[in-house]
Amino acid sequence: MSALGFPKTPSDKKALEEGAVFSPRFDPAGLVTVVVTDAEDGMLLMVAHMNAQALALTLETGIAHYWSRSRNALWKKGETSGNFQHVVEMRTDCDQDALWLRVKVLGHDATCHTGRRSCFYRTVGLVDGKGTLVDDGSKPLFDAEFTYRKPSS
Amino acid sequence: MSALGFPKTPSDKKALEEGAVFSPRFDPAGLVTVVVTDAEDGMLLMVAHMNAQALALTLETGIAHYWSRSRNALWKKGETSGNFQHVVEMRTDCDQDALWLRVKVLGHDATCHTGRRSCFYRTVGLVDGKGTLVDDGSKPLFDAEFTYRKPSS
């Protein structure tokens, strides 16, 4: 566990938006939204969430930790795949309910669980009045099926 | 109102992650998270949310519409400031619960309600064991106080 805590949201809007005190606004589930981009070329890699513990560990270790909403568990990104995220810079937005991590991805330089570099590999458009996705052709950088296989019982 | 609807999330994971049908996964509040970057230089401008209506209007008009969680209302970004967002490209992520808009900002080329170009104008770091924000010095591009003033009664 980390000892690092975060102060409550100030009631003064100016303090929240222009101040120097980091007081992240966690949602009712205790999470903030995190946008993750590549520090070198700015590519959007993923959108994830952090609770206070994941955020504290990220600040203290410089390695990105998240809260997995699907597994309901703390998630040190890269623990299985080796694709850890080294945090080059963290930013927050005007009302401190979102974070931006600029990272260097280790391992295969892949962030998506499908093996691709980015989770955003499909464009959205309207075709005959229906929302339609087009794959941008980006290829897996590692064998996700092998990496994330479950141990046989 | 828009007539455009969105199909339910497929139960098949492969269809969700690799398919061509756009089936955005709205959260229990009916929203998806939207990351907005500048189409030209990739700068992260803001994080916002869309409900189905805002998403449909965005796809149909090519101008970004959001759902304002603070005002509980549909929000055509730029309606007050003139800083509309023209959508150059929309993408979705592997499990279709987040969207990425690459936009050209009209008007003052400013996205933040403080008048700055981006909402992410402060870095986060640890100073003496406390989360501390440092302003990056980006200046307002329009007079937010004047633009968003309330009409006197």
Curated annotation (Swiss-Prot), chains A, B:
Cofactor note: Binds 1 Mg(2+) ion per subunit.
Listed GO MF terms: magnesium ion binding; phosphoribosyl-AMP cyclohydrolase activity; zinc ion binding
Pfam family, one: PRA-CH
Keywords: Amino-acid biosynthesis, Cytoplasm, Histidine biosynthesis, Hydrolase, Magnesium, Metal-binding, Zinc
GO CC field: cytoplasm
Cofactor(s) this protein cannot do without: Mg(2+); Zn(2+)
Enzyme class per UniProt: hydrolase
Residues holding Mg(2+): D93, D95, D97
Catalysed reactions, as listed in the record: 1-(5-phospho-beta-D-ribosyl)-5'-AMP + H2O = 1-(5-phospho-beta-D-ribosyl)-5-[(5-phospho-beta-D-ribosylamino)methylideneamino]imidazole-4-carboxamide
Protein's GO biological process: L-histidine biosynthetic process
Pathway(s) annotated for this protein in UniProt: Amino-acid biosynthesis; L-histidine biosynthesis; L-histidine from 5-phospho-alpha-D-ribose 1-diphosphate: step 3/9
Localization: Cytoplasm
E.C. no: 3.5.4.19
Residue sites binding Zn(2+) per the record: C94, C112, C119
Domain of life: Bacteria
Family to which the UniProt record says this protein belongs: Belongs to the PRA-CH family.
Role according to the record: Catalyzes the hydrolysis of the adenine ring of phosphoribosyl-AMP.
Quaternary structure and partners: Homodimer.
Descriptive protein name: Phosphoribosyl-AMP cyclohydrolase
Native organism: Mesorhizobium japonicum (strain LMG 29417 / CECT 9101 / MAFF 303099) (Mesorhizobium loti (strain MAFF 303099))
